[in-house]
């Protein structure tokens, strides 16, 4: 120990090199290995290699731990998706499962009569208030100028209908916007069908509106019946007046013998005859059969 204290730094380095070369030649046999905490031992003691080696103390006990051979994988930061994005993905997958392609998803609102100063940002700001937009664009002509039309595609059809009801004929930069939903009827309720029905005697002919079924028809005051509910078979009584079917009543119209002061002395002539359910069903079937013969 005293010899090491009297040696200079160069001599100590030279001696350590010679000891390491001798240990390498001997293969490290018979040399014990001391290990500390982790890769570096306590008090700077570093264990030898797999074949062992001399124990270094003092100033030369430098932590010569090699650089790590593995890299730390940074955790990939997952992009958080919004709840409505997951719902839209599920909605598109459902439509594809039933045979509807992804291009067909969404409802397009076609907008015309726009001022040339309207921009895409104006369209987005205005129509995004209604619901989620899939895409939006202003149309341009061949010269690159706005053509006065645009289209907005909503993810939900209900939003497109609401946008049409809210912004149709509304002024934007002094011009009323004209909106149209592409690819389907936009009416909330279907229009009643109108057919021409010929009466049983071949002389009576009128237009009948078939709606979504109010039970019990009604004949109005005019020659034609109004569009309120399903019209049941028109019948003729013995006095020539016109009566309605199940639950209906006869009006004051111009039916034969149906006016005021007829032979029966009442406003409607003879009262309708009570019929059973089977008779009414039979009359209804005959009415439908006659309705098919549209003249």
UniProtKB/Swiss-Prot annotation:
The gene is ALY3. SUPFAM superfamilies: RNA-binding domain, RBD (SSF54928). Belongs to the ALYREF family. InterPro entries: ALYREF_mRNA_export (IPR051229), FoP_C (IPR025715), Nucleotide-bd_a/b_plait_sf (IPR012677), RBD_domain_sf (IPR035979), RRM_dom (IPR000504). Transmembrane segments: none annotated. Pfam families: FoP_duplication, RRM_1. One of its GO terms (biological process) is mRNA transport. Residues 107-184 form the RRM domain. The lineage of its organism: Eukaryota, Viridiplantae, Streptophyta, Embryophyta, Tracheophyta. Residues 11-22, 271-288 have a biased composition (Basic and acidic residues). It is found in: Nucleus, Nucleoplasm; Nucleus, Nucleolus. This is THO complex subunit 4C. Export adapter involved in nuclear export of spliced and unspliced mRNA.
